[in-house]
């Protein structure tokens, strides 16, 4: 049976997403954009921003995989008791 996601859980997840997005945007912007003498985004700034985003996505994917591996190991080590 699939668990229902409540509206408050959805709001919480969305707030977490926005917080992560804002933090990522700020970090990549601060690292990559150095010249404010033109309105145009320079090619090196674009490349840097794309690399920053890719690095973040790879890092979060790796952490997620390790987290799943850890939980699998824990479940194998300590099996769940059956409900009677």
From Swiss-Prot:
How does the UniProt record describe the way this protein sits in the membrane?
Peripheral membrane protein
Q: Which Pfam families match?
A: zf-Tim10_DDP
Q: Which SUPFAM superfamilies match?
A: Tim10-like
Q: Which GO terms describe its biological process?
A: protein transport
Cellular component GO terms, alphabetical: mitochondrial inner membrane
Q: Where in the cell is it found?
A: Mitochondrion inner membrane
Which UniProt keywords are given for this protein, alphabetically ordered? Chaperone, Disulfide bond, Membrane, Metal-binding, Mitochondrion, Mitochondrion inner membrane, Protein transport, Translocation, Transport, Zinc
InterPro entries of this UniProt entry?
Mito_inner_translocase_sub, Tim10-like, Tim10-like_dom_sf
Intrachain S-S bonds: 28-52, 32-48
Query: What Gene3D superfamilies does the annotation carry?
Result: Mitochondrial import inner membrane translocase subunit tim13 like domains (1.10.287.810)
Extract one GO molecular function annotation from the record. metal ion binding
Short sequence motif named Twin CX3C motif, residue ranges: 28-52
Q: What is known of its domains?
A: The twin CX3C motif contains 4 conserved Cys residues that form 2 disulfide bonds in the mitochondrial intermembrane space. However, during the transit of TIMM9 from cytoplasm into mitochondrion, the Cys residues probably coordinate zinc, thereby preventing folding and allowing its transfer across mitochondrial outer membrane.
Q: Its quaternary structure?
A: Heterohexamer; composed of 3 copies of TIMM9 and 3 copies of TIMM10/TIM10A, named soluble 70 kDa complex. The complex forms a 6-bladed alpha-propeller structure and associates with the TIMM22 component of the TIM22 complex. Interacts with multi-pass transmembrane proteins in transit.
Q: What does this protein do?
A: Mitochondrial intermembrane chaperone that participates in the import and insertion of multi-pass transmembrane proteins into the mitochondrial inner membrane. May also be required for the transfer of beta-barrel precursors from the TOM complex to the sorting and assembly machinery (SAM complex) of the outer membrane. Acts as a chaperone-like protein that protects the hydrophobic precursors from aggregation and guide them through the mitochondrial intermembrane space.
Similarity comment text for this entry? Belongs to the small Tim family.
UniProt protein name: Mitochondrial import inner membrane translocase subunit Tim9
Write down the species: Danio rerio
Q: Which gene encodes it?
A: timm9
């Amino acid at each position: 049976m699939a668990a229902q996601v409540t509206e408050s859980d959805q709001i919480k997840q969305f707030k977490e997403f926005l917080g992560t997005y804002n933090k990522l945007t700020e970090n990549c912007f601060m690292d990559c954009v150095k010249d404010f003498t033109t309105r145009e985004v320079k090619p090196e700034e674009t490349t840097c921003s794309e690399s920053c985003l890719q690095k973040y996505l790879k890092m979060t994917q790796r952490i997620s995989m390790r987290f799943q591996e850890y939980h699998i190991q824990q479940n194998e080590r300590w099996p769940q008791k059956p409900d009677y």
